[in-house]
Amino acid sequence: MKRTVIMMLDSFGVGAAGDAAKFGDLGSDTFGHIAKACAEGKADIGREGPLTLPNLARLGLAHAAMESTGAFAPGFADDVELIGAYGHAQELSSGKDTPSGHWEMAGVPVLFDWGYFSEHQNSFPKELTDKILARAGLDGFLGNCHASGTTILEELGEEHMRSGKPIFYTSADSVFQIACHEGTFGLENLYRLCEIAREELEPYNIGRVIARPFDGTGPNDFARTGNRKDYSLEPPAKTVLDKLKAAGGEVVSVGKIADIYAYCGITKKVKANGLEALFDATLAEVKSAGENTIVFTNFVDFDSHYGHRRDVAGYAKGLEYFDSRLPEMLSLLDEDDLLILTADHGCDPTWQGTDHTREYVPVLAYGAGLKAGSLGRRNSFADIGQSIASYFKLEPMEYGESFI
């Protein structure tokens, strides 16, 4: 039976990419810097000691990172019995954002330039916001700036609740984010507002509109809820997900995968929030998956909870939890199944600012007759999509080189 499981550790980079300097990210290293902080006793909040990832290490994580950076991360060495094939991949796409990374790993790199709102204050054109407000029947909005999603709630959450004005903000990514309180503004109202924004943003070539619902009573307890929703553009070409679906296969989205691909190529969507629930849902879908199925999960917490918030200890704890559950996944796989663990970009929690970092991503592959050992440096994330196409005997993708 042929099945593929893709476990996408959102933002888990393994060292500055070859073109990192163009992005201001030379020297970034999500995995390496987390390991270093743990080894130095600087990540002992909620956990303690060196970063411990025995199962990821057996799959080749430390070796992939060593080939990327030239040295083993602190606490890791060439002393494990490898069971997986490992490599590290350079992003071909023009950006270091979520859609670019995901689309490229499915065989469709983003070779055009996204639109961005580059001004840190007064970020959005008045013509754009006027149209959104008019269509939504609103008399104003808050924000209009680059911001951390948690900080802006502390600063503007109460005013939003009093005034009913939505919070519009952006970042270094090609994104338009809208934060609204679920109780006072309403979740469905937020979703409708995002749909309007998605339509009005078409001329600006913005990759995503993101609904950022939150709850709480004040700055001390405002918190995002699990009802985030991404409104992405469609990929510019057919991904390997589309091709498997067209061939009669199944593509199961766990978490925000369906949103990122604008539902293209998806046959089933499973909602789950948090590392534990996402892992549980992935296991459940693998248990029930039949022939010619992809189960594709985005573990978003690594990015949203730990990377952007620059929470080194939280990131380390999350990785150790993820690692502790990998044996459950491995025990479910048949000999012919293919397991791939990778990332869509970096988000080094020790780096300046709060944005993504341009890094190599790990490519860890297990099963399907693959021999344990190095896959080397891959020239594109699209090698993953090409390998999946080869595995399922689909029409080859335009980009990427198969390692199967």
From Swiss-Prot:
Pathway: Carbohydrate degradation; 2-deoxy-D-ribose 1-phosphate degradation; D-glyceraldehyde 3-phosphate and acetaldehyde from 2-deoxy-alpha-D-ribose 1-phosphate: step 1/2. The keyword RNA-binding does not apply. SUPFAM superfamilies: Alkaline phosphatase-like, DeoB insert domain-like. It catalyses: 2-deoxy-alpha-D-ribose 1-phosphate = 2-deoxy-D-ribose 5-phosphate; alpha-D-ribose 1-phosphate = D-ribose 5-phosphate. It is found in: Cytoplasm. Keywords: Cytoplasm, Isomerase, Manganese, Metal-binding. The keyword Manganese applies. Gene3D superfamilies: Alkaline Phosphatase, subunit A, Phosphopentomutase. InterPro entries: Alkaline_phosphatase_core_sf (IPR017850), DeoB (IPR010045), Metalloenzyme (IPR006124), Phosphopentomutase_DeoB_cap_sf (IPR024052). Binds 2 manganese ions. Its EC number is 5.4.2.7. Coiled coil: none annotated. Belongs to the phosphopentomutase family. This is Phosphopentomutase. It comes from Shewanella sp. (strain MR-7). The lineage of its organism: Bacteria, Pseudomonadati, Pseudomonadota, Gammaproteobacteria, Alteromonadales. The gene is deoB.
